[in-house]
Amino acid sequence: MLLAIPSKGRLLDPTLKLLEAIGMRLLASDERALVVPTSWRDVNVIRARPEDIPYIVESGKVWAGVTGHDYVVESGASVVEALELGFGRGRLVVAVPKSSGIKTVDELPPGTRVATKFVNIAYNYFAELGKRVRVVRVTGSVEILPQLGIADAILDVMATGTTLEVHGLVPIATVLETSARLIVHPSYVNHELTKKLTTFIQGYYAAQGKKMIFLNVPASRLEKVLAVLPAMEAPSVTPLAKGDVYEVFSVVPEDELPDIVIRLKEAGAKDIVVTPIEKLIS
């Protein structure tokens, strides 16, 4: 089965980090290789431009892929957004030169030239507003075009706004919010491999900011110790061979850990061990 991932751009590194975190290691380091085997024996990775991935998944030749919500909308491809992946967040905005004095889209004059690689989104957005603009298709960086006199405005993804500011541009409207998504061909939504992948990704994110804590507790102190633990469900309690001592373990928020450990010691807990959680699957 083939999984499409970005070959370049802002989504590449976070995607590789996520795959590594769920145990799907790429088994070839040559970045020129377009099809790469992985440590998941039933999955090979195919590298592609993020804007092409919705079309590739829609074809059915590739079961799933990682790309931006903006690219999914732009493509109009018939794919299912199975998961929001928590990275690559930004806003698709209309921006104009600060010197123009324009504050809103309503102030754009008829015939305004809007440079963008999101041509379909641009046409639909301005058509819904009843604005007559000229869309200038661009495949690379668009921020410089107003300075060159090639465009009067741009429609592009803004993460922090720094790039716009450097080029003397200000956003005047948000077209849509975007982030990285796991997309799946409709016929594979309920496939076992899709369930496996989504389960491991969700488990990885669920484990973020949490630690596993183990401790021994005398029977006489058990009730006080359990009252300290903010378990997701309930702490697990196991009697040890000695009979008057229990082993207790639980999941706790990492930012609350220092305070919890002190309170556990005061309540009578001993032999406290804290470990990281790789994945938390419920």
Curated annotation (Swiss-Prot):
Its EC number is 2.4.2.17. It catalyses: 1-(5-phospho-beta-D-ribosyl)-ATP + diphosphate = 5-phospho-alpha-D-ribose 1-diphosphate + ATP. GO terms for molecular function: ATP binding; ATP phosphoribosyltransferase activity; magnesium ion binding. The keyword Nucleotide-binding applies. Feedback inhibited by histidine. Pathway: Amino-acid biosynthesis; L-histidine biosynthesis; L-histidine from 5-phospho-alpha-D-ribose 1-diphosphate: step 1/9. It is found in: Cytoplasm. It holds the Pfam family HisG_C. It is an enzyme of class 2 (transferase). GO terms for cellular component: cytoplasm. PROSITE patterns: ATP_P_PHORIBOSYLTR. The keyword Nucleotide-binding applies. It comes from the Archaea. Its cofactor is Mg(2+). GO terms for biological process: L-histidine biosynthetic process. Keywords: Amino-acid biosynthesis, ATP-binding, Cytoplasm, Glycosyltransferase, Histidine biosynthesis, Magnesium, Metal-binding, Nucleotide-binding, Transferase. Belongs to the ATP phosphoribosyltransferase family. Long subfamily. Catalyzes the condensation of ATP and 5-phosphoribose 1-diphosphate to form N'-(5'-phosphoribosyl)-ATP (PR-ATP). Has a crucial role in the pathway because the rate of histidine biosynthesis seems to be controlled primarily by regulation of HisG enzymatic activity. HAMAP family: HisG_Long. This is ATP phosphoribosyltransferase. It comes from Pyrobaculum calidifontis (strain DSM 21063 / JCM 11548 / VA1).
